Amino acid sequence: MSSQVLASSQLSDKIIARPTTNFHPSIWGDRFLHYNVSEQDLVCKQERIEELIQVVKKEILSSNHDQLKLIDNLQRLGLSHHFESEIEKLLEQLSIGTHHQNHQDLHDASLWFRLLRQHGLNVSSSIFEKFKDDEGNFKKSLITDVSGLLSLYEASHLSYVGESILDEALAFTTTHLKSIVANSKNHPLSHQISKALERPLRMTLERLHARFYISIYEKDASHNKVLLELAKLDFNLLQCFHKKELSEIVRWWKEHEFAKKFPFARDRMVELYFWILGVYYEPKYSRARKLLTKVIALTSITDDIYDAYGTIDELQLLTKAMQRWDINCMDKLEPEYLKTYYKVMLESYEEFEKELKKEELYKLEYAKEEMKRIIRAYFEEARWLNEGYLPSFDEHLRVSYISSGYVLLIATSYVGMDDIVTHETLNWLSKDPKIVSASTLLSRFMDDIGSRKFEQERNHVLSTVECYMKQYEVSEEEAVKELNKRVANCWKEINEDFIRPTSVPFPILFRIINLTKTADFMYREGGDQYTHVGKMLKDSIAALLIDPIPL
């Protein structure tokens, strides 16, 4: 009987004029559906990793070792999750006293500054005044110090709003690093410089950089053999762990037949897992990672219903039902695909409840309210499109700030985490602190800049780009330039709100930093990597989830 109803619904859908969009199907097929690995092999790897960790811990405690370089290598190689307390203690020691006064070398001074700032320690950028000449410009002699330039370039991305010396440092280093890449392709640092110019460390996904840096580190004649072995083994072990996790999520997607039930929606389960892997990769966050991946998958379907398939009358019914969040509302929904969606959404959140302890359920309730809020925003945008209404930039942003999805993702990222997330955490989040608003605005602007060409080709609500053009009477090029300036400013506000003492524990803030990095990755290249899966995203997924590092 249900199949007859569905068939009837599908027939009526063909008659209804829908704003359909043809998204390409999943490029992965069933590649990640099954996971096979030798458990004995994993045990052997884990035992060797534990041995190497103890060796490295002794090196960290050694006072005669180059501690800055060691910390930097641990982070770049993707190993810092094993040494969080040791690194924390070392950096606090390095932040006090006269350590910075000993750094007359540009590379070391910049490294000291970057490592401390990215751990929330408020060190002054005045340390770089010593590298300026009498006229207030960076010394010309620095141009030949390539490693120093690269280190200063990376440090400059930890700047605050109005920190002019770091703005000058960024302009100075960018100019000369580009020249080095163009004119000295055989320079030993050429590859690292190109990568940094493409995406600086502050904006880079940790696991992707670890994969890249392991290959660079191995070629360094002075590399630490223990660190290199540990980095390779740890990367491959985590890859196995992530592949197993992904297979569970893909099976969940397949068993619920999402692609079949919602053929108009993007089928991007693998890409979504990769996205959330950028938020947290550590094994201890497995539960949180799986839950967040499922929620972003449901949100993607919701987005496509509102943005690419549903009629305004259908969306109005669905919006009202979602605000009530009551299975009894399902009977009032038509056509059949809305009933299916509603049932799937409510049942999925019931599944999530079962995965949580009773005392954790308040976190899911908070996240559920954010889901309701994003649905209201989706409907408001659909109403604008239906009425042909062109909002002002400010009016658009009040709605699209929510529809960006990042407030929902931040809230949901905390649901599966441990006791570090408390009622106070969610109270802090509800006040929309600067780090949250900056991250959300950044993702909104980068999404709109990256997806605008595709959206202009179909009947779609106007983005912040078009609304900015209208309100300020400027060209598209000028609007994009201005929004990119705002993106850069958002990073500075994020840096400012990351400084200790913070209102919430650092693991809470790191989720926001990492979510911001995922937005940068998905939209920076002037396109929407999620909707249109290209070579960059495909290669990145292969690097993290298919190809192990040769030992």
Curated annotation (Swiss-Prot):
Q: What is known of its domains?
A: The Asp-Asp-Xaa-Xaa-Asp/Glu (DDXXD/E) motif is important for the catalytic activity, presumably through binding to Mg(2+).
Q: Which GO terms describe its biological process?
A: diterpenoid biosynthetic process
What is the required cofactor set for this protein?
Mg(2+); Mn(2+)
Name of encoding gene: TPS7FN
Where (2E,6E)-farnesyl diphosphate binds, per the record, is at 266, 303, 307, 444, 447
Q: In which pathway does it act?
A: Secondary metabolite biosynthesis; terpenoid biosynthesis
Kindly provide the name given to this protein in its UniProt entry. Delta-selinene synthase TPS7FN
PANTHER family, A to Z: ALPHA-HUMULENE_(-)-(E)-BETA-CARYOPHYLLENE SYNTHASE (PTHR31225:SF93), OS04G0344100 PROTEIN-RELATED (PTHR31225)
**Annotated binding of Mg(2+) 1, by residue:** 303, 307
Please tell me which stretches of this chain the record labels as motif DDXXD motif.
303-307
Q: How is the cofactor bound?
A: Binds 3 Mg(2+) or Mn(2+) ions per subunit.
Reactions catalysed, as given in the entry:
(2E,6E)-farnesyl diphosphate = delta-selinene + diphosphate; (2E)-geranyl diphosphate = beta-myrcene + diphosphate; (2E)-geranyl diphosphate = (4S)-limonene + diphosphate; (2E,6E)-farnesyl diphosphate + H2O = selina-6-en-4-ol + diphosphate
Stored Pfam families = Terpene_synth, Terpene_synth_C
Keywords (alphabetical) are: Lyase, Magnesium, Metal-binding
UniProt-listed Gene3D superfamilies: Farnesyl Diphosphate Synthase (1.10.600.10), Terpene synthase, N-terminal domain (1.50.10.130)
Organism this protein belongs to: Cannabis sativa
Q: Which family does the entry's similarity section mention?
A: Belongs to the terpene synthase family. Tpsb subfamily.
- Regions annotated as coiled coil: none
